[in-house]
Regions:
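Bacterial N-terminal signal peptides that target proteins for export
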Residues: 1-7
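Solvent-exposed, flexible loop/coil residues
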Residues: 5, 47, 138
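N-terminal glycine-/serine-/threonine-rich beta1-alpha1-beta2 phosphate-ribose binding loop
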Residues: 8, 14, 21-124
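Beta-strand-loop-alpha-helix segment that lines the small-molecule cofactor/substrate pocket
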Residues: 103, 109, 115-150
Length: 150
């Protein structure tokens, strides 16, 4: 996971025009997976094994899917950890997250909302990392890549 995160943030640092490479403010969309706490720990905690310097998670949007138990049953717990342990600010919309960050990670466990989430991030012209799955369908994934290429 550390290598994939390092690669993602190396790419974000190279392409981000809004932030110095050592001060990237990251936002996370979809706080219903253990990946959000794992990524936040290695970005925000210098004492963490595998710490990746140069970026900090500073903002989040809960998201979640009401029809997937592994989503709705975990989102509040992961959100609380991000707030209490790492001081992450939770916003009520993806647009608010985008206004307060330099780059975004979409982490929602459910791939179905990824296209709608990515549309907002791409429209805000923020570098974007999408965790698996890229989209809910192959057509969604293709559309995400098409939008990102524009």
């Amino acid at each position: 996971m550390t290598r994939s995160l390092l690669l993602a943030f190396s790419a974000l640092a190279l392409f981000s025009l809004n932030a110095a490479a050592q001060n990237i403010r990251a936002g996370i969309i979809g706080l219903d997976t253990s990946h959000v706490t794992a990524f936040t720990e290695i970005l925000n905690d210098p004492s963490s094994k595998g710490h990746v310097p140069g970026a900090r998670v500073v903002a989040g949007f809960k998201g979640g899917s009401p029809d997937i138990e592994s989503s709705w049953s975990r989102v509040d717990g992961y959100t609380k950890t991000l707030q209490d342990k790492y001081g992450v600010t939770i916003y009520d919309s993806i647009e608010e997250v985008c206004r307060n960050v330099d780059a975004v990670l979409i982490e929602s466990v459910d791939g179905r909302p990824h296209l709608a989430q990515a549309r907002l991030v791409i429209a805000a012209r923020k570098p974007l990392y999408i965790d698996k799955p890229v989209g809910g369908t192959l057509a969604d994934a293709r559309e995400i890549f098409r939008l990102a290429a524009e």
